[in-house]
Regions:
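Sec-dependent N-terminal signal peptides
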Residues: 3-13
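N-proximal helix/coil linker or "cap" segments that precede and/or mark the start of modular domains
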Residues: 15-30
């Protein structure tokens, strides 16, 4: 019984140890090779979340349209590209859709939003490392130092979209 309790406590601590909270820099994650990476095959690292304000859309392909109003609102803001970067990370392990179909759709999105960095996560790396909601659409914003300044798991309301825009403006 004592061993079981120790095991359960260890599992709980390991599961919560990497959750990112507001005002914190998330633990480093790197998506490369079998774990994922950019559309062009190059690796992506969370170390890149510095120097500019970044917004990450971490999305299950089945929820791809959930936060379109937020991405469209950000696009309309025309934030300067030397101070702002959007990143779309696709949780490919969260869907039954074949990767080739998703990759085709991502290439179309890349053409529509050329300033956005598109990244594939084949193994739910961010779900595990940052405790992001799985099978969902998540929006996270980071300041120039890589500190989390906004987080929403699920659909953003109109008020939350305005809050996101305000937080970005305040940190540019």
């Amino acid at each position: 019984m004592k061993c079981l309790l120790i095991l359960l406590v260890s599992l709980f601590l390991s599961q919560t140890a990497y959750s990112i909270d507001m005002g914190q820099v998330p633990p480093k994650v790197e998506l490369k090779e079998k774990l994922g990476g950019r559309l062009d095959g190059k690796p992506w690292s969370s170390d890149e979340l510095q120097g500019k304000v970044h917004v990450i859309f971490y999305v299950d392909p089945d929820e791809k349209d959930t936060n379109n109003p937020a991405s469209e609102a950000l696009d309309k803001e025309k934030f300067p590209s030397d101070k702002f970067q959007s990143v779309a990370i696709i949780n490919l392990a969260a869907t039954w859709l074949p990767n080739f179909a998703i990759n085709s759709a991502l290439k179309e999105k890349q053409e529509r939003y050329p300033k956005t960095i598109y990244v594939r996560d084949y193994k739910k790396v961010l779900v595990q490392a940052w405790k992001i909601a799985d099978d969902s659409s998540n929006v996270l914003a980071f300041d120039k130092k890589g500190i989390l300044i906004f987080r929403k798991d699920g659909k953003l309301s109109a008020e939350e979209i305005q809050k996101l825009i305000k937080v970005i403006r305040e940190n540019l």
